[in-house]
């Protein structure tokens, strides 16, 4: 039976990670399993920055964003010699199992440790929602709400000055944040990696929108990486329409903030089940939520899945562009 479990968060932080950590600690305590915290992700695992969770008030982090055990990117972990040191650091403390919370890069690290004999469970922690072995990743719902709040405020000032404003959101190739924030805010144009429009096409729509009586604002929601220079695109739209057009890149504000209620619930469920699966002797699996049920997928299979639900997102983006422009 598992006696000791370590927890680490890796890659980009996301709201809800603290809730997952809390659930792991509490569920493990229920079964007399000791938990250890690995500080600063795989970098900390390599450097031996591992401490018992005893004395930590995990409840105090339930409403905090980010990750209280911190995160880091450590590309050297792809090399076996670094992973071997990390494994030895776990074994020296008698730690038999590890829960890794992060995105696809974190999943790759978790899989390698599983292959080296460490019992490993991966949980999807990223705002991008690009781990498709789960309907929702930890951090996505909060980021979506953050974007909606920001765009609502941007709409206020755009309406005051009769402007078009382009808003770039994160997603790292996945279009979920752009599409669903665009739906929620009534963005007149949604452009993503799954549904692209040219500058001329956008300008035509903007011009038509402002021909409506009393129309005061147009919001264009754009996924990151669609355009290399959003300021330049905004300038081109302004030149084609004679409508003042600004560009706003929301950037890292999307990764911060207190987790939403749904986030806390999802993260708690996944954290609890990570312990239960390890207790059952399972390893090398990624947990997620599919149709509100906990689903387990081998990490290798999860990594092989497309990072975007392209066909669905493309259809929905076109459909809701049509609706929002009506």
From Swiss-Prot:
It is an enzyme of class 2 (transferase). Pathway: Carbohydrate degradation; glycolysis; D-glyceraldehyde 3-phosphate and glycerone phosphate from D-glucose: step 3/4. Its cofactor is Mg(2+). ADP binds at residues 22-26, 155, 186-188, 212, 215-217. The active site is at residue 128. Its main location: cytoplasm. One of its GO terms (cellular component) is 6-phosphofructokinase complex. It catalyses: beta-D-fructose 6-phosphate + ATP = beta-D-fructose 1,6-bisphosphate + ADP + H(+). Substrate binds at residues 126-128, 163, 170-172, 224, 246, 252-255. Allosterically activated by ADP and other diphosphonucleosides, and allosterically inhibited by phosphoenolpyruvate. It comes from the Bacteria. Belongs to the phosphofructokinase type A (PFKA) family. ATP-dependent PFK group I subfamily. Prokaryotic clade 'B1' sub-subfamily. This is ATP-dependent 6-phosphofructokinase.
């Amino acid at each position: 039976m598992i006696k000791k479990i370590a927890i680490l968060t890796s890659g980009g932080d996301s709201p809800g990670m603290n809730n997952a950590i809390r659930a792991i600690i509490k569920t493990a305590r229920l079964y007399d399993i000791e938990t250890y915290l690995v500080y600063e992700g795989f970098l900390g695992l390599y450097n031996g920055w591992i401490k018992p969770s005893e004395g930590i008030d995990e409840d105090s982090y339930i409403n905090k964003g980010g990750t209280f055990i911190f995160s880091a990117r450590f590309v050297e972990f792809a090399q076996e010699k670094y992973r071997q040191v990390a494994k030895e650091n776990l074994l020296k403390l008698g730690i038999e199992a590890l829960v890794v919370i992060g995105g696809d890069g974190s999943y790759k690290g978790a899989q390698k440790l599983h292959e080296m004999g460490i019992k490993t469970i991966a949980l999807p922690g990223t705002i991008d929602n690009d781990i498709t072995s789960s309907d929702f990743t930890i951090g996505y719902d909060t980021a979506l709400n953050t974007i909606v709040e920001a765009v609502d405020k941007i709409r206020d000032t755009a309406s005051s000055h009769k402007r078009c404003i382009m808003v770039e959101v994160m997603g790292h190739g996945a279009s979920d944040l752009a599409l669903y924030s665009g739906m929620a805010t009534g963005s007149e144009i949604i452009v993503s990696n799954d549904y692209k429009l040219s500058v001329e096409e956008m300008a035509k729509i903007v011009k038509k929108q402002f021909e409506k009586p009393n129309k005061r604002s147009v919001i264009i929601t754009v996924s990151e990486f669609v355009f290399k220079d959003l300021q330049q695109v905004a300038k081109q739209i302004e030149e084609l329409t004679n409508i003042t057009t600004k560009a706003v890149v929301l950037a890292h504000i999307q990764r911060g903030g207190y987790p939403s209620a749904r986030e806390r619930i999802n993260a708690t469920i996944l954290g609890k089940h990570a312990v239960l699966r390890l207790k059952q002797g399972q390893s090398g699996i990624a947990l997620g939520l599919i149709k509100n049920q906990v689903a387990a997928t081998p990490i290798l299979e999860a990594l092989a899945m497309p990072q975007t639900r392209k066909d669905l997102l493309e259809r929905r983006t076109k459909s809701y562009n049509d609706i929002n422009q009506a």
